[in-house]
């Protein structure tokens, strides 16, 4: 299990692992069961930085740090999937052509435009928070977006033969329960630590999982299934949904 965790950590994040790992495809393909734990690590790093130095700089500065930190710690892995997915979806081509576009390394104008709007909305959400709320939100966002990733892998058919095929073939009901448990424990723990309403965090968690499922179901219609790029894209969109949800739920005074 430790080897599986570390192999996944080197793939899903840029966090260095000491020593040399003996690669095992079988163990690597099981790594998504630790997706929420990887989110705890990356989100924890960013939250700790903000907690330690949050009072030294204004909130709009930390909003930029959060976005840059998320991109760096993930190696832009999910962003690449988001851009490829948007290019394919908004190409208005048939299913086979869309799948070809997913494999194209070039980025189209639609993807660039949508990604610009994505960054503005994400930045605006985080910039609206105090440093303490920023630290809390980036922590739960990193956990939840990866937790929903396993839900999507498990719930929808895979199309193609790229890297994500191994993740899909090894997804199981036990793995789904395990990742749900991690996500629930980690987010509730974060809420308790930051003195955030447990009811609110449960609402956000439920809405985020529902959001990821609905997006995945819609994208499945475009591609006849999902690919590894789609997995990353859906996780990125969920990573935007969470801070927006925190902002809206706090402002409208839900519970």
Curated annotation (Swiss-Prot):
Keywords: Cell membrane, Cobalamin biosynthesis, Magnesium, Membrane, Transferase, Transmembrane, Transmembrane helix. Pathway: Cofactor biosynthesis; adenosylcobalamin biosynthesis; adenosylcobalamin from cob(II)yrinate a,c-diamide: step 7/7. It is found in: Cell membrane. GO terms for molecular function: adenosylcobinamide-GDP ribazoletransferase activity; cobalamin 5'-phosphate synthase activity. The keyword Flavoprotein does not apply. It holds the Pfam family CobS. The keyword Transferase applies. GO terms for biological process: cobalamin biosynthetic process. Its cofactor is Mg(2+). It catalyses: alpha-ribazole + adenosylcob(III)inamide-GDP = adenosylcob(III)alamin + GMP + H(+); alpha-ribazole 5'-phosphate + adenosylcob(III)inamide-GDP = adenosylcob(III)alamin 5'-phosphate + GMP + H(+). It is a multi-pass membrane protein. The chain crosses the membrane at residues 33-53, 57-77, 107-127, 136-156, 174-194, 196-216, 234-254. Its main location: membrane. Its EC number is 2.7.8.26. GO terms for cellular component: plasma membrane. Joins adenosylcobinamide-GDP and alpha-ribazole to generate adenosylcobalamin (Ado-cobalamin). Also synthesizes adenosylcobalamin 5'-phosphate from adenosylcobinamide-GDP and alpha-ribazole 5'-phosphate. Belongs to the CobS family. HAMAP family: CobS. This is Adenosylcobinamide-GDP ribazoletransferase. It comes from Carboxydothermus hydrogenoformans (strain ATCC BAA-161 / DSM 6008 / Z-2901). The lineage of its organism: Bacteria, Bacillati, Bacillota, Clostridia, Thermoanaerobacterales.
